[in-house]
Amino acid sequence: MRVTVSSAQVLPGGFELPLEPRLPRIGAVDQVALEERAASLAKRSIKKESKLQALELAVRMMDLTTLEGSDTPGKVAALAAKAIQPDPADPSVPSCAAICVYPNLVPAARERVQGSGVKVASVATAFPSGQSPLPVKLRDVEEAVAFGADEIDMVIDRGAFLSGRYAKV
């Protein structure tokens, strides 16, 4: 598949179309080799200290998310408390990286994580479908940033991407 565009169609960041050469190619999966490799890894013994370090790293990199239509500041407060202290019985467990909420709940999230080192992420660009017009998506991002989000999690219009309409994405 090839996307043909005029030279005037340049994406933000200076990316010109076509994008196909920049997109990863996924080849065929060798099911037998995959299963053999998985079985081999499952037999490996990981030392206790390495496991502990890996688990701590995983927690420190984790974002806790609530993206339901029924979200409230109270639910965000509970999520923030969990992110700050994932295991109340064990204060040595590190905090999570961030909590992710809808833009309108960013102020409540910021208030709850203030001073803890936990960041506030927000979804944008017409989550979850990504199928809104660009001006709506941009406004969505601007609003989340204005409310104080440290990080923006964006979604793309997967339908446009999968059908090769990369300029729309």
Tell where the protein language model's regions lie, with residue ranges.
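Short, mixed-charge, low-aromatic patches
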Residues: V10-F15, D30-L41, S95-C100, A126-L134, ...
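Charged, compositionally biased N-terminal leader segments and the immediate start
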Residues: R2-M62
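Metallocofactor- and cofactor-centric catalytic cores in central/energy metabolism, strongly enriched
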Residues: E20-Q31, L41-E49, T65-V76, P88-V101
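Alpha/beta enzyme core
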Residues: E49-L57, S70-P94, N104-V169
